[in-house]
Structures are given as structure tokens and as C-alpha cells.
Amino acid sequence: MILYIIVAISILLNIILGIKVIMLQKELEEVKKATRLTKEEVEKLNERIRKLKLGG
């Protein structure tokens, strides 16, 4: 009887952890999208770096 309770708790915890992993994966994907630079932004940054190198 105790074994069934332990197995049930284990399965429940695995389901909860699986849901949490999916939530964290979605959150990570949102962070990746937010930190991705566009091609234009990269070009602007490179231009600033070139100007700083030439000026300094």
C-alpha cells in the first residue's frame, strides 16, 4: 500500500516538474528573442566601433 502511495507521489512530482521545464523553456525562448540583435543594430554598433577606433 505504501509503495503505491510513493509511486503516485513520484508520478505527480514528475508531471509537475515536466510542466515547470516546459514553462522555463518558453521563458528562455522569450529571453533569446529579446536579446537578439537585428542586422541593422549590429551594423550600427560596428560603425560606432569603427569611429571610436579611428577617433581614439
Curated annotation (Swiss-Prot):
Its main location: membrane. One of its GO terms (cellular component) is membrane. It is a single-pass membrane protein. It is found in: Membrane. The chain crosses the membrane at residues 2-22. Keywords: Membrane, Transmembrane, Transmembrane helix. It comes from the Archaea. This is Uncharacterized protein MJ0546. It comes from Methanocaldococcus jannaschii (strain ATCC 43067 / DSM 2661 / JAL-1 / JCM 10045 / NBRC 100440) (Methanococcus jannaschii). The lineage of its organism: Archaea, Methanobacteriati, Methanobacteriota, Methanomada group, Methanococci.
